[in-house]
Amino acid sequence: MAKSKVVEKDKKNELDNQSADIELKGQSKNEESKGGKKKVIIVESPAKAKTIERILGNDYQVISSKGHIRDLPQKQFGVDLNSLKLDFEIIPGKESVVEQIKKMTSGKEVLLPSDQDREGEAIAWHLSTILGVKGKNIITFTEITERAIKEAVKNPREIDMNKVNAQLARRVLDRIVGYMISPLLWRIIKDARSAGRVQSAALKIICERERERYRFVPQKYFKVWIDIAGLKAYLTKVDGKKIKPTDITEEISKDVLQKVKSVRLVDIDVKEVRKNPPAPFITSTLQQDAASKLGFPVSKTMKIAQELYEGVDTKEGHTAFITYMRTDSTRVSDVAKEAAEKFILKNFGREYLNESSEVASKKGSKTKGKVQDAHECIRPVDVNITPEKAKELLDKDHHKLYELIWKRFIASQMSSAIYKQYSYDFESGKYVFEASIRERIFDGFEKVYTIDNEPSEKHKELKVDQEYLVEPKSAEAQTTPPDRYTEASLVKTLEMEGIGRPSTYATIIQTLLDRGYVVKKRKTLIPTILGFVVNHYLEQRFPDIVDKGFTAEMEKELDEVENGKKDWKEVVKSFLKEFNKDLERAKNEFFAIDFDTDITCEDCSGNYKLKVGKYGLYLHCPNCKTNKALKSDVFGVIDGNKLYVLEEQESQEENGEKNSVQSEESSANSGNRKFYRKRRTSGSKKSSTKSASSKAKKK
């Protein structure tokens, strides 16, 4: 099997090599036909090359390296742990690409556009090193527009080696963890694929949530309310004391149903509240919104966003639509602010302009640590390409994402929405019921960003000290366990914990899925038994690697390298000092996969044990010595030293799978109800209502 994969990989490399070779030769012929261009720009992707060449015309030749061209060796460690000298090699299959680039750039001025993150700077550094290019040859831009590109080529700069060093440190740390832990994993857990530095911390977060859900014991409580003038007023006080919904017992519920026949309105509070516009998108918030509103996986969002940034073929030519999509800054350039202001004034009026254009752009993200770079937010490159116009230029999914970005950006530059909030307190003996409702009096940014249903006006007829006939209602409910992570909520958690960076979120999730440590069911991320076993091993042998605090601290140190405050080699050596202790212990101490389970043996009624053998995880009965394969569709939780199998309680139809097309978050809500531990009771709700339909009547 491994040999087959190698052969397939070699064939793929050969095809990629031939494809790139043909492309570069074509570019060379094109150069000759134009009389030979003196300046060459090398970008990563053919799409970006096409867009930039259309902008710059005949003065520049723009060619593509088709991605990375140099990295640490695939089949060797490539790092001298004493000197930290790195043994880079041309990526297999890219040799002829490099040779062609060398020929085409010989004797010419070379410019290297760098994506505005560490990885982009490192790619430019690799290219400049291979080509022997020195001096000011780096150009940067956040959007592929005529203004931005022409401005960039006028102002080249030198390579930022602090950025490069931060990326080298990240690459070396990842290589150390992957190269040194993975063989130990393979020795103990045959099914395990590998262990990554940041992915392992993310796996632990997912496993901890599943364990938390397993340990959760539902608590029964009652919701008690009255319907009055289009409002739903809930019981909030008993004998003058605030009461939480979870503290409302069946006894209280029955007492309310029996005794409350009418209520008196004791207070109305009316106040004006402002709802501020959202900040423009950064990578993480775009991923979260695209998941919850469009149902896009993170990887799909980033793929489409990259294409919108680099440019897509339209009937009007190869056109870029958005700014750079890997960013953790909400900053908006002065040019973009001015364009948005003109658009808003023309289409909506002065009252829709943000009181301060800085408000939204100063919000930023809640990421622990620093924003990686003071770059721009994700926004449309031309606000005049409205979603309506873009619909004629883009396919369905590209248009959906563009519309999301366009609306978010325009909304961020608009004024606040203004609401009038009404709060009502109703009293009946020792019981107080509270209700509130908001009425929008000015839509502001919500004119483009959201559509709210108009509330009922009946509540305005209510008067203080008036008494109203009511028929209270009650419904039994249960507290629910914390939701499983979706891709969107995991990205939010990783961002808030300071784990990873915008460019890595999609890779982290995809790697866990590809390795079989996590599966996606109804848009929720569920750790597999293999994922739990791998996490258990890493927790026991390499606790720092899976510790989110430690991982976040490493990100801060990489930030300090980028800021020139720390030497990258010292950061790596400091990591190695502690890591080597765990590594030696893991090498020398015996570790066995031997978990008790709650799975019953069909032959002797004893309980199986979970073990690992030549072909991976299996079940073994210690009493009758029988073995049983562990099916891949079995899910469980390892808590302590025992595996508890989870059972599927609800059918797909009950989860609303029949005819609905759901977003990630709405799908996740049903998916989060799907697996429960064996001894947990069903979460069905019982209703107890005094009347199926009741209307508030003025007494």
Swiss-Prot record:
Its cofactor is Mg(2+). Keywords: DNA-binding, Isomerase, Magnesium, Metal-binding, Topoisomerase, Zinc, Zinc-finger. Its EC number is 5.6.2.1. It catalyses: ATP-independent breakage of single-stranded DNA, followed by passage and rejoining. Residues 661-672 have a biased composition (Polar residues). Residues 674-683 have a biased composition (Basic residues). Residues 194-199 are annotated as: Interaction with DNA. GO terms for molecular function: DNA binding; DNA topoisomerase type I (single strand cut, ATP-independent) activity; zinc ion binding. Residues 1-15, 22-35 have a biased composition (Basic and acidic residues). One of its GO terms (biological process) is DNA topological change. Residues 1-37, 649-699 are annotated as: Disordered. It holds the Pfam family Topoisom_bac. The keyword DNA repair does not apply. Residues 38-146 form the Toprim domain. Residues 160-583 form the Topo IA-type catalytic domain. A zinc finger (C4-type) spans 601-624. The record marks 68, 170-171, 174, 179, 186, 326, 515 as: Interaction with DNA. The active site is at 324 (o-(5'-phospho-dna)-tyrosine intermediate). Residues 684-699 have a biased composition (Low complexity). Mg(2+) binds at residues 44, 115. Belongs to the type IA topoisomerase family. PANTHER family: DNA TOPOISOMERASE (PTHR42785:SF1), DNA TOPOISOMERASE, TYPE IA, CORE (PTHR42785). Releases the supercoiling and torsional tension of DNA, which is introduced during the DNA replication and transcription, by transiently cleaving and rejoining one strand of the DNA duplex. Introduces a single-strand break via transesterification at a target site in duplex DNA. The scissile phosphodiester is attacked by the catalytic tyrosine of the enzyme, resulting in the formation of a DNA-(5'-phosphotyrosyl)-enzyme intermediate and the expulsion of a 3'-OH DNA strand. The free DNA strand then undergoes passage around the unbroken strand, thus removing DNA supercoils. Monomer. This is DNA topoisomerase 1. It comes from Fervidobacterium islandicum.
